[in-house]
């Protein structure tokens, strides 16, 4: 399979039995998805992990879109109703209320938005409004899923330290 674009979200100590015991080892394994001359979007990550991925990308002539450099996002709203402000790819999107709960979803949405904007030239129906609508309507059962309003009852399937930290932050 030849991708049109690749994305690597944050790097955390997860699946260490398969990917490695350090962030650098895990980053190296995740960089395995990079393909020669195919652009890649990197989420916010540990500087050491990012250096590893940047080295692998340079070796494959992979154009990178990096959090905080080629694009950025500001967090707003509340944990149950996060609001994204995005700047990147020559565009600005303000006050996008995400369908997914959790402030960490702002980072995930910014990655997805960057990927989608890069694909617009290949997919004419992938308009700015369609992308924003998708972010607003997205749902993920089991991820900060509201089961009851009164009293408030939430369910989450966090299973690693990074996921648990995001859950606590929410």
Indicate where each model-derived feature is located.
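Nucleotide phosphate-binding/pyrophosphate-handling subdomain across enzymes
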Residues: 1-7, 11-12, 16, 25, ...
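Flexible active-site lid/hinge loop adjacent to a nucleotide/diphosphate
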Residues: 1-48
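Extended acidic/charged loop-beta regions that coordinate divalent cations
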Residues: 1-18, 50-93
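Generic secondary-structure signature for well-ordered alpha-helical cores
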Residues: 31, 35, 55-63, 118-124, ...
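Conserved beta-strand segments of alpha/beta enzyme cores
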Residues: 39, 63-65, 152
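Conserved beta-strand termini and adjacent loop/short-helix elements that scaffold enzyme active sites
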Residues: 43, 67-69, 147
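Glycine-rich beta-alpha junction loops
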Residues: 46, 70-73, 100-102, 159
């Amino acid at each position: 399979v030849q991708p049109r674009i690749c994305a690597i979200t944050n790097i955390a100590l997860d699946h260490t039995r398969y990917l490695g015991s350090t962030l650098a080892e895990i980053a190296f394994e995740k960089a395995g998805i990079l393909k020669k001359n195919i652009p890649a979007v990197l989420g916010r990550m540990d500087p050491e992990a990012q250096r590893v991925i940047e080295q692998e990308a340079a070796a494959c002539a992979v154009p990178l879109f990096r959090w905080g450099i080629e694009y950025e996002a500001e967090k707003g709203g509340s944990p149950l109703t996060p609001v994204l402000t995005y700047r990147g790819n020559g565009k600005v999107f303000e006050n996008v209320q995400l369908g997914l709960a959790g402030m960490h979803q702002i980072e995930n949405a910014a990655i997805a938005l960057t990927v989608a904007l890069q694909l617009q030239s290949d997919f004419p129906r992938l308009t700015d409004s369609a992308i924003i609508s998708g972010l607003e309507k997205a749902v993920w059962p089991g991820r900060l899923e509201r089961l009851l309003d009164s009293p408030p009852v939430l369910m989450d399937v966090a299973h690693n330290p990074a996921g648990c930290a995001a859950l606590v932050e929410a």
